Regions:
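Hydrophobic residues at beta-strand termini and immediately following loops
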Residues: 8-10, 82, 141
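An accessory alpha-helical subdomain
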Residues: 116-127, 143
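Catalytic donor-sugar/metal-binding loop of nucleotide-sugar-dependent glycosyltransferases
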Residues: 129-142
Length: 143
């Protein structure tokens, strides 16, 4: 169509979480710069740009306690850690931009996670979080 938007059907939607959804979309992600949108978010403003300087994940700030996936940033403003739960924290929320360079590193790990028993209810972000923490290599070596 005019904007080259792809809507994908995931036959595992009722029994698996978003890891399976992004796994199903992997051929559209390889070698491309891609936005991923959450189906339950509404964007008031046009968020698309003809150029993005790199991969990013949007975030929102929560005052007080939260059970969301909270972010820690390094001095350059890049995500350096993610933990479930926090206080007065930025958390993962909304659209994501995956650069082809990021996807080249991330997709092989996501594909391997999809094959591991027990990952059926993983969010697609779990392999990324495990990569940040150095746990992805360990998990993959043990399976």
């Amino acid at each position: 169509d005019k904007y080259d938007v792809k809507l994908l059907y995931n036959p595992e939607y009722s029994c698996k979480n978003t890891l399976a959804t992004v796994y199903r979309a992997r051929k559209f992600l390889k070698g491309r710069n891609v936005y991923i949108l959450s189906s339950d978010n509404w964007m008031r403003e046009n968020m698309y740009h003809s150029y993005e300087c790199g991969a990013w994940y949007s975030a929102a700030h929560e005052e007080g306690e939260t059970k969301e996936w909270c972010l820690t940033f390094n001095k350059k403003g890049r995500i350096s850690d993610v933990n479930v739960g926090g206080k007065d924290a930025w958390f993962m929320y909304g659209p994501v931009y995956l650069s082809r360079e990021f996807s080249a590193k991330f997709l092989p790990v996501l594909e391997a996670y999809y094959q591991i028993p027990g990952t059926e209810q993983f969010y697609w972000e779990q392999p990324y979080v495990d990569m940040l923490k150095g746990e992805a290599k360990r998990r993959l070596e043990n399976n």
